[in-house]
């Protein structure tokens, strides 16, 4: 059985090299939504950052530094261990915006000396929704299916996105096909 995982990242910039990943959350896509993972707050590892990125999540650089709990390497090793525990084979990465979230995770794993367990691909929830709804321009409507508030806490955001993905798959009789 392939394990599908929804991931959400918060960062202090638009991409690695222009900011640091602050923290991330993940949920296994399953009806119970019992298996979630919250990374520790990661020490800034890039001197460059965008104050607007911090403002968007209600944090400052000073608060980030003061609340940091782990190095990037420690955070990624913890996530890799959780993925190994929850996945028998290569997990599938899902996100609201994999162009953003996947790049941080993909940068984090090799920075920690770990191969990316997800490989080199990711799936975007909005594209699946638009395709199943047969409405190619409607890539945002799925966000109304979240039950957990989207508040820039990455665990809450990952859970809300997983809830929406499950609702989409149920509506189109695809959930059982995905999780078997």
What are the roles of these predicted feature ranges?
Residues 83, 99-120:
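Substrate-recognition/cap helix-loop segment adjacent to the acidic, metal-dependent catalytic center
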Residues 17, 34, 67, 105-106, ...:
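Hydrophobic alpha-helical membrane-insertion segments
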Residues 92-98, 103-104, 108, 138-180:
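Acidic, Mg2+-coordinating catalytic module of metal-dependent nucleases/exonucleases
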Residues 85-88, 111-114, 170, 174:
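Secondary-structure boundary motif
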Residues 1-99, 148:
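Conserved non-catalytic scaffold segment of RNase H-like nuclease domains
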Residues 42-59, 122-162:
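Active-site-proximal helix-loop-helix substrate-binding element of RNase H-like nuclease domains
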Residues 8-10, 101, 124, 157:
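Acidic active-site catalytic centers that drive phospho-/nucleotidyl reactions
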């Amino acid at each position: 059985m392939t394990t599908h995982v929804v991931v959400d990242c918060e960062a202090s910039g638009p991409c690695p090299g222009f900011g640091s990943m602050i923290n991330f959350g993940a949920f296994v896509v399953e009806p119970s939504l019992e298996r979630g993972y919250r990374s520790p707050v990661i020490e800034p590892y890039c001197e460059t950052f965008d104050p607007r990125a911090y403002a968007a999540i209600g944090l400052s650089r000073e608060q980030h530094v003061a609340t940091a709990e782990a190095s990037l390497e420690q955070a990624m090793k913890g996530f890799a261990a959780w993925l190994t525990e929850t996945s028998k084979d290569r997990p599938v990465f899902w996100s609201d915006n994999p162009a953003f979230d996947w790049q941080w995770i993909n940068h984090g794993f090799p920075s920690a000396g770990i191969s990316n367990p997800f490989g080199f691909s990711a799936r975007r929830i909005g594209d699946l929704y638009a395709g199943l709804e047969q409405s190619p321009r409607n890539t945002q409507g799925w966000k109304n299916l979240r039950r957990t508030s989207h508040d820039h806490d990455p665990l809450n955001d990952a859970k809300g996105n997983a809830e929406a993905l499950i609702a989409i798959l149920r509506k189109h009789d695809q959930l059982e096909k995905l999780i078997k």
